[in-house]
């Protein structure tokens, strides 16, 4: 007879609490915090991807109400992961450097799930695929690269709501990063002036974009505070590389602000 389901067995608490394996000698007290925070990030990234996939489906089904609800959930998660930076910043540079060497070449740059999030949001770079080419998870990332982005689903949503989206946008090469489109901007200006329901969804997408930029900014400042302008453990330029990634995912929604 099988045992009754418990809190611990349902959530696999024993397995979960055995996943933190410090590598430093001692180990250093602060390494556990570093591991826990990054593992929690990965769990939130998993949930964000789950929500983004759902959001794409909702947009393609023209379900505005549930789409807004899904975006609100993602925004709340983003606020949570931004707040985790506050916890990380309780660690001083000396405390981090006490175990930094134990990380060897491991780096947040190697987070496959965050690269998946970037791809879903339309920020696609072939070099990222090459970086993960030797890993078993490369196939999953390649699939994300080949799939339409959230913005493509949004354009489909606009089409369902009666807006004539140019064929070159609907049929665009989805492996390319998004670039601003004057034609789409003209449509969006009309949306804002005439359709409160759809323009409200546009504003929630702006919130989403801003939320990711806020997290990137806090991440940059945390890295600067901890290691200054040193090279990252994975070989990147550290804070300088992170700062270069603070750019909007949905440029058309930002470009129309001056014309509203």
Swiss-Prot record:
UniProt xrefs under Gene3D superfamilies: 1.20.58.480
Enzyme Commission (EC) number: 1.13.11.11
InterPro entries to which the protein is assigned, alphabetical: Trp/Indoleamine_2_3_dOase-like, Trp_2_3_dOase
Pfam families attached to this UniProt entry: Trp_dioxygenase
Cofactors, names only: heme
Subunit and partners: Homotetramer.
UniProt protein name: Tryptophan 2,3-dioxygenase
Species: Herpetosiphon aurantiacus (strain ATCC 23779 / DSM 785 / 114-95)
Protein encoded by which gene: kynA
């Amino acid at each position: 007879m099988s045992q009754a389901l418990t809190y611990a067995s349902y959530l696999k608490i024993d397995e979960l609490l055995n996943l933190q394996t410090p590598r430093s000698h001692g180990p250093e007290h602060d390494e556990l915090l570093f591991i826990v925070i990054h593992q929690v990030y990965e769990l939130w990234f998993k949930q964000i991807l789950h929500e983004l996939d759902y959001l794409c489906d909702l947009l393609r089904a023209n379900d505005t109400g549930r789409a807004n609800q899904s975006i609100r959930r993602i925004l709340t998660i983003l606020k949570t992961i931004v707040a985790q930076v506050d916890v990380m910043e309780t660690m001083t540079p000396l405390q981090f450097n006490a175990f930094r060497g134990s990380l060897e070449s491991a780096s947040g740059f190697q987070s496959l799930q965050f690269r998946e999030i970037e791809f879903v949001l339309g920020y696609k770079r072939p070099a990222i695929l090459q970086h993960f080419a030797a890993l078993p998870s490369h196939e999953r990332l390649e699939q994300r690269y080949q799939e339409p982005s959230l913005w493509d689903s949004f354009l489909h949503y606009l089409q369902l709501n009666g807006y004539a989206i140019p064929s070159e946008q609907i049929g665009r090469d989805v492996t390319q990063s998004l670039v601003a489109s004057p034609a789409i901007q003209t449509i969006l200006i009309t949306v804002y002036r005439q359709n409160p329901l759809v323009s409200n969804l546009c504003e929630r997408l702006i919130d989403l974009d801003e939320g990711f930029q806020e997290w990137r900014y806090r991440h940059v400042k945390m890295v600067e505070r901890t290691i200054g302008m040193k090279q990252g453990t994975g070989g990147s330029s550290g804070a300088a590389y992170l700062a270069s990634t603070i750019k909007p995912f949905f440029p058309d929604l930002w470009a129309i602000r001056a014309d509203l």
